Structure formats: C-alpha cells, structure tokens
Curated annotation (Swiss-Prot):
Residue numbers spanned by region Small ATPAse domain (RuvB-S): 185-255
Signal peptide feature range: none
Native species: Pseudoalteromonas atlantica (strain T6c / ATCC BAA-1087)
A GO MF label: four-way junction DNA binding
Listed name of the protein: Holliday junction branch migration complex subunit RuvB
UniProt subcellular location: Cytoplasm
Similarity annotation: Belongs to the RuvB family.
Pfam family, one: RuvB_C
CDD domains: AAA
Length: 335
C-alpha cells in the first residue's frame, strides 16, 4: 500500500535499521524524553539489581517509532544481562518459543516485539514460563503423549506492542510493569536531532534541528529519517550547512508541511471534509475512499492526527476538527 512509501511513516524502513542501531542510546542516562518512564524504570532496575533478582516482566506500548525496542535494550544493558530479540509473528509454534526460553541465562531478557500477534498456542506456553519459570511441553503423540515440566532460570520478558488493547487479559495481567510511551515534545525531539547529527558529523545549528523536530510528528524515528534527507539536500544545495531555512526548504521539497503532514495525512483529512462533510464517516468507508487499509489508518495515520487535535474518533465515526479546516484554508461550518 501507499503507507510503505511514506517518508514520515513511523514504522521502521530497512535504511533506518543500521543507522538507528548506531545512534541508539545504550543507557537510561542517554535516553531523551519519556521522563516519567525513565524515572520509574531507573528505580525498578536499581531495586532488582540490589536484590540480584530478575526485573519484573515489562510491557511497553505506544505508537510505532517512539523507542520501545531502544528501551528494551537499555533495560538489558542497565541490568548487565543479555537480551534475545524476536517478534510475535515469528513465533509460529510452541517449539519456537521453547527454544528461546531454554537458552536463556539467569536474569536474561527476552524481548518480543508485536507481542499482540502471538498465536494462542504459543501464548499458552508463555503463561507458566512467566509466572513460575516453568516450561510445559508435550512429548510424543496420540495416547502416548505426555507432558513434562522443565525448570527455567529467572528471566525478564519484555513485550512491545502498538495495540495494548489486543492483548488477552491473562497475558496482560502477567506483566508486573506496564509503561506507555507518549509522543515526544519539540524540545526533546530537538535534542534527539542534535544528538543524531553529532553521531553523523553534520553541521547543524539549533534552529535547523528545531525545524526538523517540528515536522517529525512527535516521533524520534521520523526525526532521524528526516535528518538524513535534509543532510542530502544540504550537501548539494548548501555546502553541508543545515540552518532553519535549509531544513525548511528541504522538507518543503519532500512534501512534509509545517505540521509534519504528508500526502496521506492531507488526503485523509481533506477526503473527510470534501466527501463526507467533515464526518462522521465509518472506518470502512474512509479506507475505501482513500485506498488504504483499515489497520494502517488506525495504527499509523490516525494516532498523531488525533493527538494533535485534527481528528476525532467517535462512536458514529471519524470527525474532522475545526483545526483541520483552518489548516487547509476551509471555512468551518460545524455539522
């Protein structure tokens, strides 16, 4: 779908992975933003280390691109243990999970991204592992099949999800710590852009960093991606100097406006205004009208628009706010 080509999509692109790993903070002291989360995690980690215990199982949720994977790796680094990483869709069979669990050392971290996509059979195996550090596996088939219990070392499961509401209650209830990551403010994003520019050895001033931050939709992954594209523009058009004017010109060229909107954001909002009189409009109708999938609209496009007050989800459907009308130069006539 069109979402896969978006410069400002918050999900990771292949080009992001290598650079993001290089500039990713390794410890809580280097982590910018999410102050409340960091303060709590610092206390929980120090307490667990003082007792020589595994950290309680941790669930991290929030929109994509906000640093869930980064935080999971920081937790492992702060605890001084190894981390094994996988994702819900990869764990197709109970044996896939069993292989990971039986290779964990004491107090290690197992990180499962997209944990809401675990299959029911794998999830069932996870319950006793999380609660009692035991693995129940079946040996044999048919009438000769029998269950055996394997003892596991104490470990920490860190689950990450963009859809906390999709987790089953039994799984959600087994996490001792639950943290929600919020969209970043411009001040914190500016610091992230400056830190990334330092690692990339770029000539970027404060105003240039802030201009990139303002258009990053509250998402560090987007900030870093926009920074790389602005770098390309500056190398050709401005001798590598990234000022506010250079950043603004580059992002205008890339079709990312002052609010961080791209073509898909504008299409969604203006479609509701032009074709559905500002709403309400149901999700299925909206998806058909803009040619995008329901999940992409719900998980990728809408969260930032709702958080910024341009769009509302109501029981009757999606409604565009007065702010959206004014942003696009429409006369506002409440429905």
């Amino acid at each position: 779908m069109i979402e896969a080509d978006r410069l400002i999509q918050p999900t990771a692109l292949r080009e992001d992975e290598v650079i993001d790993r290089a500039i990713r903070p390794k410890m809580l002291a280097d982590y910018t933003g999410q102050d409340h989360v960091c303060e709590q995690m610092d206390i929980f980690i120090q307490a667990a280390r003082k007792r020589s215990d595994a950290l309680d199982h941790l669930l991290i949720f929030g929109p994509p691109g906000l640093g869930k994977t980064t935080l999971a790796n920081i937790v492992a680094n702060e605890m001084g243990v190894s981390i094994k990483t996988t994702s819900g869709p990869v764990l197709e069979k109970a044996g896939d999970l069993a292989a990971l669990l039986t290779n964990l050392e004491e107090n290690d971290v197992l990180f499962i991204d997209e944990i809401h996509r675990l299959s029911p059979v794998v999830e069932e195996i996870l319950y006793p592992a999380m609660e009692d550090y035991q693995l129940d596996i079946m040996i044999g088939e048919g009438p000769a099949a029998r269950s055996i219990k394997l003892e596991l070392p104490p470990f920490t499961l860190i689950g990450a999800t963009t859809r906390a509401g999709s987790l089953t209650s039994p799984l959600r209830d087994r996490f001792g710590i639950v943290q929600r990551l919020e969209f970043y403010n411009i001040k914190d994003l500016t610091q992230i852009v400056k830190r990334s520019a330092h690692f990339l050895e770029l000539n970027l001033d404060e105003e240039g960093a802030m201009e990139i931050a303002k258009r990053s939709r509250g998402t560090p992954r987007i900030s870093n991606r926009l920074l790389r594209r602005v770098r390309d523009y500056a190398e050709i058009k401005a001798n590598g100097e990234i000022s506010s004017d250079v950043a603004s010109a580059a992002l205008d060229m890339l079709d990312v406006d002052k609010e961080g909107f791209d073509y898909m954001d504008r299409k969604l909002l203006t479609t509701i205004i032009d074709k559905f009189m500002g709403g309400p409009v149901g999700l299925d109708n909206l998806a058909a009208a803009i040619g995008e999938e329901r999940d992409t609209i719900e998980d990728v496009i809408e969260p930032f628009l709702i958080q910024q007050g341009f769009l509302q989800r109501t029981p009757r459907g999606r409604i565009v706010s007065q702010r959206a009308y004014l942003h696009f130069g429409y006369d506002y006539e409440p429905n």
